[in-house]
Amino acid sequence: MSTFDLTQRMAPFLDLHLIIPLLEFIEPRGIYDEKSLTEMHRQLLTKTNMIDSVIETYNGKPIPAAIEAKKKQIIKERDELKSKVDSVVAILEIPEVKEMMDNNRERDGNVRILEHLTQNHNFTVDMVDTLFKYSKFMYECGNYTVASVCLYYYRNLVNQADPNYLNALYGKLASEILLQEWEHARDDLLKLRAYIDANPFDTEWELVTQRAWLMHWALFVYYNYPKGRDEIIEMFLNQQPYLNAIQVLAPHLLRYLAVAVVTSKSRQKNSLKDLVKVIDIERHSYKDPVTDFLTCLYIKYDFDEAQEMLQKCEEVLSNDFFLTAVLGDFRESARLLIFEMFCRIHQCITIEMLARRLNMSQEEAERWIVDLIRTYRIEGAKIDSKLGQVVMGVKSVSIHEQVMENTKRLTLRAQQIALQLEKGRQDKVKAT
């Protein structure tokens, strides 16, 4: 199943600390060679300051002298930074200062806070730099609680033109993700998105790249947040700039968008058609059992292959860090889609035939279908108990809807071509 594992494709868009949980998830699943994966895990940890975690990977074997020396250096640097930052934090934790930060909503609020600290508490610009260095160091050590608090302070002291402002936004978000504080993580995600959408970057390509990064980080939040899957649909599918970024830089994100759409109770019906179009367009650059399931069902109308793909989807989702928890929802929703499409294609089908396909008695199948229609409000579905049939009404598509859909498709393709041209231009610049 390593064929469908996306860890290597996603890693370039993630911070090292966010890659580590993905490796820890796949290690016991036997997807890759255990020794090589353990070594990769150790190499990643070595690039951070989580030196105790590095030592644990040796499992009682002799620790290299370089690792022991690095541990001493980290402890020394931590103590030096802490001695400098203690006085800074003491000022920032004064009740009146904390209140100003908590109530900071205005665009120029950071300037006013810094002016207040400078005038009333002997605060200096060097202290701001010390705070950022300590925040970054503690994050690298895996102390995400301290990093989160210090980055919160830092974010309230500098303006958006500060060279470390974007790094602070990402660092705060990563800290909350790794602490599994999903409410705070969502707030930080929205702040980061607002900053990126304001486009403070030099080139269009840099903006597209930042959006691709943001969507990868958003998976941690939205697949752990109530109604987060609806927010994935809104961001990944309904916002054209983000959809463009998926198509140009990260088509593998279509897996997560597809699962979000299939399992969404409120947005599935309105989003499936647009999703299938995107999957069809991107089939040449990305496909997996999840996208192939929808292709078989809505483009090929091959129900036997769709059922085969659904079985593969279960294995894919069970080995996916983000999707393993929604496997049950996906299975239930996917079966419903097969049933609904099968009935709609045939318009009229006997309950006896459905019972055979579902491996149920005729009475059980009829009750199951009644529950489906009642629970999911399947449009146009009716049961004729006397004839033992399920009848699906036909929904006509107006000329206006057809024109709108074709216009949307042309717009999508035009924007994608423009981004591909920009990518080609950037590649030429790098080559010269």
Curated annotation (Swiss-Prot):
UniProt cross-references to InterPro entries, sorted A to Z: eIF3e (IPR016650), eIF3e_N (IPR019010), PCI_dom (IPR000717), WH_DNA-bd_sf (IPR036390)
Organism of derivation: Caenorhabditis elegans
Residue ranges annotated for the PCI domain, each copy included: 221-401
Top-rank lineage group of the source organism: Eukaryota
Cited HAMAP family: eIF3e
Subunit structure: Component of the eukaryotic translation initiation factor 3 (eIF-3) complex.
Presence of keyword Transferase: no
Organism lineage: Eukaryota, Metazoa, Ecdysozoa, Nematoda, Chromadorea
GO molecular function, one term: translation initiation factor activity
Key words, A-Z: Cytoplasm, Initiation factor, Protein biosynthesis
Subcellular location: Cytoplasm
UniProt function note: Component of the eukaryotic translation initiation factor 3 (eIF-3) complex, which is involved in protein synthesis of a specialized repertoire of mRNAs and, together with other initiation factors, stimulates binding of mRNA and methionyl-tRNAi to the 40S ribosome. The eIF-3 complex specifically targets and initiates translation of a subset of mRNAs involved in cell proliferation.
Protein name: Eukaryotic translation initiation factor 3 subunit E
Family assignment from sequence similarity: Belongs to the eIF-3 subunit E family.
GO cellular component term, pick one: eukaryotic translation initiation factor 3 complex
An example Gene Ontology biological process: translational initiation
Coiled coil (residue ranges): none
